[in-house]
Amino acid sequence: MTMNETTSSLLEPDRDWWRGAVIYQIYPRSFQDTNGDGIGDLQGITARLPHIAGLGADAIWISPFFTSPMRDFGYDVSNYVDVDPIFGTLEDFDALIAEAHRLGLRVMIDLVLSHTSDRHPWFVESRSSRSNAKADWYVWADSKPDGTPPNNWLSIFGGSAWQWDPTRLQYYLHNFLTSQPDLNLHNPQVQEALLAVERFWLERGVDGFRLDTINFYFHDRELRDNPALVPERRNASTAPAVNPYNYQEHIYDKNRPENLEFLKRFRAVMDEFPAIAAVGEVGDSQRGLEIAGEYTSGGDKVHMCYAFEFLAPDRLTPQRVAEVLRDFHRAAPEGWACWAFSNHDVVRHVSRWADGVTDHDAHAKLLASLLMSLRGTVCIYQGEELALAEAELDYEDLQDPYGIQFWPDFKGRDGCRTPMVWESLPDGGFSSATPWLPISQSHIPRAVAVQEGDPASVLHHYRRFLAFRKANPALAKGEIEFVETRGSLLGFLRSHGNEKVFCLFNMSDEAATKELPMKRLEPLEGHGFVSEILDHEVKLPAWGAFFARLA
């Protein structure tokens, strides 16, 4: 019996658990420190799992904790099958899984398969010569006759995507940092090695994966130049506007059709184990939803994907929400999306969409309820349940190489990665040492312990609405049909079997009234919102919502 069979036996053997689930993302460096080094660790996650279970989440997603030189804080892996000592040990991970399963939480881990660290033994061997056993495990190419890179591909972190290696006298591809060389998945041996990594963690007991940069796995064998992207098609959803990466149409350096066959192989391994699921991160500013549709259709690749439509700086409006949901349905009528408003890579959404907001908490509660009412699976990022705003850091405190590169026009990702606040203490209850990133003092009044004592807090609202979602399966798994609305109102009907739930949201700082679009509506309670019904109209306060069952 594998560890997966042993620990997963504590959970219901539901192969469809992921559909409509609520997944809580943990950034381990910033969650809880237990050994006093200022960096969060696996034992800290285990200690805080009751908080997540108490929210009502179904699963956790843990950002990378593998052995790494930490140039990109774990997204540069030097050993896929071990835990970095700053986070703990494999035994600590086993204990984490056991406790999560005891609490009814499934565990998903973040796999970074498109690239490794330049310290990974595979790359150390690959760069040593052109004739070694792993010479073709990474993407190597000769220079042009004048010594310049093989083509015009750009790194998302700035500059050319090619780095010269003086030993091989060739360039290697890096879509991200120069210390993150891209693996060559055209090589069958590389695919086998990555599938072995997948199997290792499944046998260890994980319930699924978040697949980082899933559309970057393959590159064009011919290394053709990317075409220019006309200005009117550019947007800043996956890279900041100051980054020239947005000036290209990325049809050759990523989004390659060969990826579909590899994802089928990855899925086949998952299907050997009970109740496993994967969510893919699709990073593309023009074709994100289309690619997400390709990767989730057919039931033979990944179970769900998320693109950056709701992680982008674009203002969230009723029209935008409806547009994104409809676009995804057109791209993938049989696919499944995973929606998030915040994560470890973007400005926290309560700050990103704060223009014109006067009631921070009401705004946060409305956005949480909207997110958890959309058709799809939901990801919540740590601290989101506290309505934490983006932290402001001085340049001297920055750790993120992305922010350092583009400062001050783009301040990087550190502002959303500052430590979690548990207690109303200067250190937030995070660590007894100086934390790796400074704790925002504006976060302290929003600590878990503070909000626990306030039934009207955002934390209590998250718990309340998660329970409401579970009590109404149409919100988790139902179809969605948008209702005609105007101005700041967004309305839709969620349908699952015989259950139909009408949802109405006021996405503004001013009260709004809506004529009820259907008769025989029975208002629902337990969601935390108050509205006023007069005749056939419902009046919503600023940042208010209304839910009713169609009788």
From Swiss-Prot:
It catalyses: Hydrolysis of terminal, non-reducing (1->4)-linked alpha-D-glucose residues with release of alpha-D-glucose. Keywords: Glycosidase, Hydrolase. SUPFAM superfamilies: (Trans)glycosidases, Glycosyl hydrolase domain. One of its GO terms (biological process) is oligosaccharide catabolic process. CDD domains: AmyAc_OligoGlu. It comes from the Bacteria. The record marks D345 as: Transition state stabilizer. The active site is at D212 (nucleophile), E272 (proton donor). Its EC number is 3.2.1.20. Pfam families: Alpha-amylase (PF00128). The keyword Hydrolase applies. One of its GO terms (molecular function) is alpha-amylase activity. Belongs to the glycosyl hydrolase 13 family. This is Probable alpha-glucosidase.
